[in-house]
Amino acid sequence: YPAGVIGTTLENLQAAAAGEHEEWSADYPKFAQIAQEEGFADIAAMYRNISNAEKGHEERYRAFVKNIETAQVFAKEGEVVWQCRNCGYIHTGKTAPKVCPACLHPQAHFEVMKKNW
C-alpha cells in the first residue's frame, strides 16, 4: 500500500477504496484458504468475516467518491436535516450552511443528521 502519499480527498478515497477492494477480494480470502488448508477452521472463518467488513469499507469509500464527483457532499436533491458536528446546530434544507450560525464553524463541519439510537 502506498505510504507517505497524500493526495486530494478524492484521490485518497479512490486509493483507499482500491486498497479495500484488494483486501476483501484477494488478501483475506487467500489468508482464509491458507488457514483452512493448515487446519485452522476458526481462523479461516475469521478471515472470511474480515473480508466481509472490508467489502463494506470499499462500498462506503466509493459512495464518498460519488458524493464528491457529483457535488453531493454538502448539497442534496431534496431537503435533509444537517447537523453541525461541532456544536450540534440543526438546519433543514437542500444545502448545509456555509458557516454554522451558532458556532461559526465552516460548512465542512456539517453532516447529514443521523439518528442511530
Could you say what each language-model-derived stretch is?
Residues Y1-W117:
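Non-heme di-metal
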